[in-house]
Amino acid sequence: MAYPMQLGLQDATSPIMEELLHFHDHTLMIVFLISSLVLYIISLMLTTKLTHTSTMDAQEVETIWTILPAIILIMIALPSLRILYMMDEINNPSLTVKTMGHQWYWSYEYTDYEDLSFDSYMIPTSDLKPGELRLLEVDNRVVLPMEMTVRMLISSEDVLHSWAVPSLGLKTDAVPGRLNQTTLMSTRPGLYYGQCSEICGSNHSFMPIVLELVPLKHFEKWSASML
C-alpha cells in the first residue's frame, strides 16, 4: 500500500506489476538521458559565442536526428507491447470472480460456487478500530488464493467505475452493459488496497477495494464458512 510522502510506486506483489516496474525504470532512464542531452545543448547555445550562419543544410545530421528518435521509440514500444500482451493473456484461471460497480460500493460473486456473493461497503470513519485505515477499510474483503491465477470479470450497474489495485498492477474499467476481464496472481499473502479510479459521482472517494490473499487451504476454509 502507499505511505505518506512516498515518491515511488507501490511494491510489486504480482508478476505483471514487477514487469511494469521494470518498464517504468527503463523508460525513465531513456527520458532522463534525452533530457540531460537537451539541457546540455541548450546550455552550450546560451554560453558559446561561436556561430555558423553559412550552413544551409546538413544531410548527415538530418538523417541522424530522424533515425535516432525512431530507434529510441522502438526501444520504448517493444517492451510496452510485450507487457500489454502479457496482461491480455488469460490461460485456464483457477478461480473466477465477477465484480460489479455501484454508486458507491462494489459487489462480488464467486461464479465457481453456487451461492457465494456479497456487497463490499466502506467502513465509516466513526466505526474504525485502532490500526485500521481511513477510507480504505471495507466490511467484506475479497478473499482470494495466492499463487493461483484468478480471473476478474468487471462491469457496472449504473455509471462508469474503475476497479484498481496498484500493488497488483490492476486497473480495469467497469462499463455498464460491458463485461471486461483481467487476471491477477499474487506471489505473497497479505492485504492489498485499491479504490475506484474513475470519477463516478459525489461519493467516488468512498469506494475502496480490499483484497486478502491467503494460502489455498485458508481460502477453502473461508469459502466453506461463507456457503
Curated annotation (Swiss-Prot):
Mitochondrial matrix side: 46-59
PROSITE patterns (UniProt xref): COX2, COX2_CUA, COX2_TM
Entries under CDD domains matching the protein: CcO_II_C
UniProt EC number: 7.1.1.9
Pfam families to which the protein is assigned, alphabetical: COX2, COX2_TM
GO cellular-component term (any): mitochondrial inner membrane
Location in or out of the cell: Mitochondrion inner membrane
SUPFAM superfamilies listed in its UniProt record: Cupredoxins, Cytochrome c oxidase subunit II-like, transmembrane region
Cofactor: Cu cation
Catalyzed reactions per annotation: 4 Fe(II)-[cytochrome c] + O2 + 8 H(+)(in) = 4 Fe(III)-[cytochrome c] + 2 H2O + 4 H(+)(out)
Transmembrane segments: 15-45, 60-87
Binding site for Cu cation A2: 196, 198, 200, 204
Manner of cofactor binding, per the entry note: Binds a dinuclear copper A center per subunit.
Residues at which Cu cation A1 binds: 161, 196, 200, 207
Entry keyword annotation includes Protein transport: no
GO MF, one example: copper ion binding
Mitochondrial intermembrane side: 1-14, 88-227
Chief localization: mitochondrion
Membrane topology annotation: Multi-pass membrane protein
Keywords: Copper, Electron transport, Magnesium, Membrane, Metal-binding, Mitochondrion, Mitochondrion inner membrane, Respiratory chain, Translocase, Transmembrane, Transmembrane helix, Transport
Alphabetical list of NCBIfam families matching this protein: CoxB (TIGR02866)
Subunit text: Component of the cytochrome c oxidase (complex IV, CIV), a multisubunit enzyme composed of 14 subunits. The complex is composed of a catalytic core of 3 subunits MT-CO1, MT-CO2 and MT-CO3, encoded in the mitochondrial DNA, and 11 supernumerary subunits COX4I, COX5A, COX5B, COX6A, COX6B, COX6C, COX7A, COX7B, COX7C, COX8 and NDUFA4, which are encoded in the nuclear genome.
Protein name: Cytochrome c oxidase subunit 2
Primary gene name: MT-CO2
